[in-house]
A protein has these predicted regions:
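C-terminal alpha-helical interaction appendages
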Residues: 1-71
């Protein structure tokens, strides 16, 4: 599975903070997962229900980012 470049990740995070993240309504983990899914659905789906799935648990955000970012 192709991972994201830093430029692609920047696009995802821009979308998070402009369109997806609403504190008190949508958690950051949900917003990040949804943004990745919007642009890269296969990549997001490959991490669903894994130890890196941050949709339900914000403590997994760093693991999600590690899994999607091509370092």
């Amino acid at each position: 599975m192709k991972k994201l470049t830093y430029e692609e990740f920047g696009k995802v995070m821009h979308n998070v903070y402009v369109h997806e993240y609403f504190p008190g309504v949508i958690r950051l983990g949900q917003a990040i997962f949804n943004s990745v899914y919007k642009y890269y659905p296969e990549l997001a789906n490959s991490l669903r229900n894994t130890g890196a799935d941050c949709f339900y648990n914000d403590n997994k955000i760093i693991h999600f980012i590690d899994a999607i970012l091509d370092k």
